[in-house]
Amino acid sequence: MFAMNDIKGQVAVVSGSTSGIGLALARAVAQCGGDVVLNGLGDPAVIEQTRADLAAETGVRVLYHPADMTQPDQIADMVATAHRELGRLDILVNNAGIQHVEAVENFPADAWEKIISINLSSTFYATKAAIPIMKAHGRGRIVNIASAHGLVASPFKSAYVAAKHGVIGFTKTVALELAQQNITCNAICPGFVETPIVAKQIEDQARTRGMTPDDVMKNIILGSQPTKRFVTTDELAGLFLYLVSDLGASANGSHFSVDGGWTAQ
């Protein structure tokens, strides 16, 4: 009853999955026997090696689509390619995200627009493209990777906080619209996870706050989480697999915190 065998043979599209959280979730699907479409930035040779390694390790089909998450047409093509090449689409993970750290009065307008586009609007465009396919199939699972910053705020992250709050609101709306279609939509709200985006944040926070990187790590990054450690990608993957399995059918329109107690404070 509690095996994840129902994921075998399914198809997942995971945006922002060439590293970090996205890659961990894509790997979790593949390890359960599901086919995967990767997407994200990076060196093309490294991305191809990642794709080939994941396919070889798990024996499933793994594709890569280079969709730019600021371009609605490319996002729609990514979803359509998964359906066309792999025959179906069962799981959509909206994970792509970027960050910029700056006070509101100095926040560059182009950085604001890009963060809203990638962190929020891409979630809308991918979901819009996926819904008709999932409806036709009679089942679907949409998981949006929000953040603890979708529930609380921190200084110098206005665009990121606004986008992630928006993701949670969008998640609830989609869940209500599709509640009788056997399609669920949920959000996972991680705390700080040791990923490339967090590594860059440490440098940016040090600059903005006039602190050393070590002090940022101790007092700002891990200081937010009562456990005083990073959330692991395996911990996120465990929750994710539940949400996309048949056992997660009644989890809908919810946000799930995995933040070491950060948002309990």
Where on the chain are the PLM-derived regions?
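Short C-terminal tail/terminal secondary-structure segment
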Residues: 2-6, 21, 151-152, 229, ...
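Conserved glycine-rich cofactor-binding loop
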Residues: 11, 18-19
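Conserved glycine-rich Rossmann-like NAD(P)H-binding loop of the short-chain dehydrogenase/reductase
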Residues: 32-49
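Substrate-binding pocket helix/loop in short-chain dehydrogenase/reductase
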Residues: 103-104, 108-116, 142, 221
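Active-site helix of classical SDR
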Residues: 127, 163, 171
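Residue(s) in the substrate-gating loop at a strand-loop-helix junction
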Residues: 147
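Short, small/polar-rich loop/turn modules that mediate ligand/substrate recognition or access, typified
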Residues: 179, 184, 251-253
